[in-house]
Amino acid sequence: MIETGLRNSSQGIETFGLRNLAGVHWNLTEPQLYEHAIAKGEARLAAGGALAANTGVHTGRSPKDKFVVRDATTEGEVWWDNNGSITPEQFETLYQDFLAAAEGKTLFAQDLYGGADPAHRIAARVYTEYAWHSLFIRTMLRRPAREELPGYVPELTIIDLPSFKADPARHGVRSDTIIAVNFTRRIVLIGSSSYAGEMKKSVFTFLNYLLPAKGVMPMHCSANAGKDGDVALFFGLSGTGKTTLSADPARTLLGDDEHGWSNTGVFNFEGGCYAKTIRLSKEAEPEIFAASDRFGTILENVILHEDTRVPDFDDGSLTENTRSAYPLDFIPNASPTGRAGVPKNIIMLTADAFGVMPPIARLTPAQAMYHFLSGYTAKVAGTEKGVKDPEATFSTCFGAPFMPRHPSVYGNLLRDLIAKYQVDCWLVNTGWTGGKYGVGRRMPIKVTRTLLTAALDGSLKDAAFRTDPYFGFSVPSSVPGIEPHILYPSKTWADKADFDATARKLVAMFRDNFAKFEGHVDAAVRDAQPQVRIAAE
């Protein structure tokens, strides 16, 4: 077996059970991985230096093909209503079949960390079949210093083999695609998907399982900090604006997707950003645009001009879920440590497909827990396989696919931290205004940024507020720089009766969805539910 690169001499492939490999490339750097990816025909070089790869049939995550091993340890800890399960025996068969499938292959291995806080991180070793996948995960997680590698000991091992096809009858799974998570043995097996995001979300899933037991809140959120160190968290599903809104030139970026909150502050789980690039423009998102075509960036399913190799970010012919993965330090004002103090503001982002929610609302602590547990948004086109048009959905904790434990575990942690640190909470609609999806328009990003600036600098707290008659939260009556009517959703609709009916429909959906949580929350949170306060027109 041929081995190249640097690793701990006592932590080779045999510690995971791999055998008869043709070779392993350990902890290769960006130029080395570029050379392998291009030589193997996995990817092409874009004009500005990015590495462009296509993922084939899987252009998003496959949440229905993710299974957690149900054993004596996880039986009482995992939220089985939300997580598919396989037996330890089925996992062992799958594991042995993965090892057999790897024989004769040359793999790429990266020794990395999930978590910027040494007290709460996990050492994740990732074996990949593709060189560009190795570059992706090296970009997205946090790297040890080169001199640390000889002493590195993995605590979690991921093996990513897109060529592996699962057998539903043999392995107890749904299709030939598989993401198998074993919390007890600390292993993740990924097969038959080339979508690189599966790897990073597998590390996130592990941290979401492990950290609550330590009193640390894992969060599907972006985070940034003002010049005075005031931290803001942005919760939201993919496509709701976490990456875009946290990349603010006036604030220091901690990260765009995954963070932890301990008693010492907030820390990023990752070392990179994974930005949606469909219709990305230099004018609207200059920092992300600049980061998305330079050496070290991976472009996923982005079309390149046939002759010039210039990326066409307007071309969604492969998928609407085009992506750019780049190191955090490609953003000029990114935090070098990925760590900061406790939050001052929490922003819950929703892409309201019905177009009836205001662009911003202030939440009480009880309302914040209610909306966190509800996780209302829209599935935005292409983020998951099979989703082309936005559709209303409730994803608890703004990240149900990645939350192994019951939502109340995360909700109670969040409520306690909000109360302890007196955090201001806001709901921001980055979705539709002037009508539902297909009729109205997407909320202008300049409106959202103006409102966010007012919330984060404290000036919005001095505004006059009114109570929304449908949802009960507080909405500013006027904000400098914002056209007044946009703060009143009903005034943006041509048909007021249609607005009323649509708002009532959404209120009913909220209440129906929350019924499953009512036994897990106190009276204050139950009373924070939307209640229509006006008679039908």
Swiss-Prot record:
Keyword ATP-binding: yes
A GO cellular-component term linked to this record: cytosol
Keywords per UniProt: ATP-binding, Cytoplasm, Decarboxylase, Gluconeogenesis, Lyase, Manganese, Metal-binding, Nucleotide-binding
Reaction catalyzed: oxaloacetate + ATP = phosphoenolpyruvate + ADP + CO2
This enzyme's EC code(s): 4.1.1.49
InterPro entries assigned: PEP_carboxykinase_ATP (IPR001272), PEP_carboxykinase_C (IPR013035), PEP_carboxykinase_N (IPR008210)
Compartment annotation: Cytoplasm
Free-text cofactor note: Binds 1 Mn(2+) ion per subunit.
Residues reported to bind substrate: 61, 195, 201, 323
Annotated metabolic or biological route of this protein: Carbohydrate biosynthesis; gluconeogenesis
Keyword Ribosomal protein attached: no
CDD domains, A to Z: PEPCK_ATP
Residue numbers binding ATP: 201, 220, 236-244, 285, 323, 448
Gene Ontology terms for molecular function: ATP binding; metal ion binding; phosphoenolpyruvate carboxykinase (ATP) activity
Main location: cytoplasm
Entry cofactors: Mn(2+)
SUPFAM superfamilies: PEP carboxykinase N-terminal domain (SSF68923), PEP carboxykinase-like (SSF53795)
Disulfide-bond pairs as recorded: none
GO BP terms, alphabetized: gluconeogenesis
Record-linked Gene3D superfamilies: 3.90.228.20, Phosphoenolpyruvate Carboxykinase, domain 1, Phosphoenolpyruvate Carboxykinase, domain 2
Amino-acid positions noted as binding Mn(2+) in the UniProt annotation, renumbered to this chain: 201, 220, 257
NCBIfam families: pckA (TIGR00224), PRK09344.1-2 (NF006820), PRK09344.1-3 (NF006821), PRK09344.1-4 (NF006822)
Family: Belongs to the phosphoenolpyruvate carboxykinase (ATP) family.
Function recorded in the entry: Involved in the gluconeogenesis. Catalyzes the conversion of oxaloacetate (OAA) to phosphoenolpyruvate (PEP) through direct phosphoryl transfer between the nucleoside triphosphate and OAA.
HAMAP family (UniProt xref): PEPCK_ATP (MF_00453)
Protein name: Phosphoenolpyruvate carboxykinase (ATP)
Organism: Azorhizobium caulinodans (strain ATCC 43989 / DSM 5975 / JCM 20966 / LMG 6465 / NBRC 14845 / NCIMB 13405 / ORS 571)
Gene: pckA
